[in-house]
Amino acid sequence: MLGEFELVVLLAVLRLGDEAYGGSILEEIARRTRRPVARGSVYITLDRLEAKGLLGSERGDPTPIRGGRAKRFFRLRPRGLRVLKRTLADLGRLQEGLAVLREGLMGA
């Protein structure tokens, strides 16, 4: 099973498709979770997911706006998609039948 932030990063990469690079992934996570996200955490997690074989990456063309640096674009590999689907299914089974999730914690 994936860790929580690994799951969030993979979902962001999947959602962004061809536009999944470090900055866009960070913005997508912050916007969707409404939580601050540390740039270093995103890049460390991307590197770890790539080392696990769940993500692939390639460099785009250098741009003057980035001081001549190229963006590094990420994509889910087939194994990454399988692990993502399995993790989401596992989480779904874990929360099945938990009335507290339907009714709110302690009636809140």
Show the residue positions of the predicted features:
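Basic amphipathic alpha-helical segments that dock to polyanions
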Residues: 42-49
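Exposed loop/turn and edge beta-strand positions of beta-sandwich/beta-sheet ligand-binding modules
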Residues: 70
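Short aromatic/hydrophobic contact patches that present stacked aromatics
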Residues: 10, 73-75
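N-terminal helix-turn-helix DNA-binding core of bacterial DNA-binding proteins
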Residues: 1-41
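Amphipathic alpha-helical dimerization/coiled-coil segments
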Residues: 79-108
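Beta-hairpin "wing" of winged helix-turn-helix
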Residues: 52-67, 75
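Short, well-ordered turn and helix-capping elements at secondary-structure junctions
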Residues: 29, 33, 59-61, 78
